[in-house]
A protein has these predicted regions:
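A short glycine/serine-rich beta->alpha loop
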Residues: 111-115, 251-257
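Short functional linear segments
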Residues: 1-46, 52-66, 71, 107-114
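Aromatic/hydrophobic pocket-lining residues that form π-stacking "cages" and hydrophobic walls in ligand
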Residues: 57, 127, 207
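Acidic, Mg2+-coordinating active-site environments of NTP-dependent enzymes
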Residues: 110-111, 135-142, 157-249, 263, ...
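ATP-dependent carboxylate-amine ligase catalytic core
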Residues: 29-37, 63-155, 171, 201
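Histidine-centered active-site/metal-ligand motif
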Residues: 43, 75, 169-170, 258
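Short glycine/threonine-rich catalytic loop with a Thr-x-Gly-x-Asp
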Residues: 68, 234, 254-266
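Short, surface-exposed alpha-helical segments at coil->helix boundaries
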Residues: 4, 22, 96, 204-208
Length: 273
């Protein structure tokens, strides 16, 4: 398949009324040897701030000499935008080869078992597949929507993060902050450390309750780590970061007070990693 054909093929699996659940993802990835279980995954959810937090974390891990896979959504121009290792997007030829492999599964003898597979499930599976085959040191997976039933949530992460909670996708996730927080907290795993960003109290209470039930150690913004704005310089923000593990002054490459919260959370994730 060429670039146009890959776009058309995967777009044909786009739907406005998906059947949510992880069963198809589990079946699909099992047919590919369960690549998602061969990775060290940092799983990031939340309403806003995911992209910036992931970018900060990716850069810091990269400076440590690690090969860092990043899966993000949505794509800007082409599906290659969603899958990258450090600064390099998946090559178009490699993506096309993987799409051919997945097409043979979805349209071949396993078609019945995989009926209802969506565009996002396919590209998520391809990301896991690519990162495993490239043997990245760590894969940062961004939740697409919600968390509990999001197709990224088949992984067994070493670390999870929830950035913020706001009213988004209310028709699917719930019409209250508490209901949405419960969906976002679906990525929390038994005993796996959780870092939370600047989350409103009513939503944080739900997340903390779920984390406690799953015995997940927590690093909470404003409690276990703090950031304080020190001023704007050029195109970035200067802030102090304080936690039991480190204290220091940092500068972001992006303007906006919310960016110091994103950067602070990325530092907390790095120190937990």
């Amino acid at each position: 398949m060429n670039k146009n054909e890959t776009n058309q093929w995967i777009a044909s699996y786009r739907t406005d009324q998906p059947h949510f659940g992880l069963e198809r993802m589990v079946r699909l990835l099992a047919l590919r040897g369960n690549p998602h279980l061969k990775l060290k995954v940092i799983h990031i959810g939340g309403t806003n701030g995911k992209g910036s937090t992931i970018a900060f974390l990716k850069n810091m891990l990269g400076k440590m000499g690690l090969r860092v896979g990043v899966f993000s959504s949505p794509y800007l121009i082409h599906y290659t935008d969603q899958i990258a290792i450090n600064e390099e997007s998946i090559p178009e030829a490699r993506l096309e080869t993987l799409m051919v492999d997945y097409r043979s599964l979805l349209e071949g003898e396993h078609a019945h078992d995989l009926q209802g597979t969506t565009e996002f499930e396919i590209i998520t599976a391809i990301a896991y597949d690519y990162f495993a085959s490239e043997q990245v040191d760590v894969a940062i997976m961004e939740v697409g929507m919600g968390g509990l039933l999001d197709s990224t949530n088949v992984c067994q992460p070493i670390l999870t993060g929830i950035t913020t909670i706001g009213l988004d996708h209310v028709a699917l996730l719930g019409d209250s902050l508490e209901a949405i927080a419960e969906q976002k907290a679906g990525i929390i795993k038994q005993g796996v450390p959780l870092v939370t960003g600047n989350i409103v109290p009513e939503a944080l209470a739900v997340i903390n309750q779920i984390a406690k039930a799953k015995e997940a150690p927590r690093l909470v913004y404003g409690e276990d780590y703090q950031v304080s704005h020190q001023g704007s310089v050029g195109t970035g923000e200067v802030f102090d970061y304080t936690s039991p593990l480190r204290q220091g002054r940092f500068q972001t490459g992006l303007l906006g007070l919310h960016q110091i919260e994103n950067a602070g959370m990325a530092i907390a994730l790095l120190d937990t990693f």
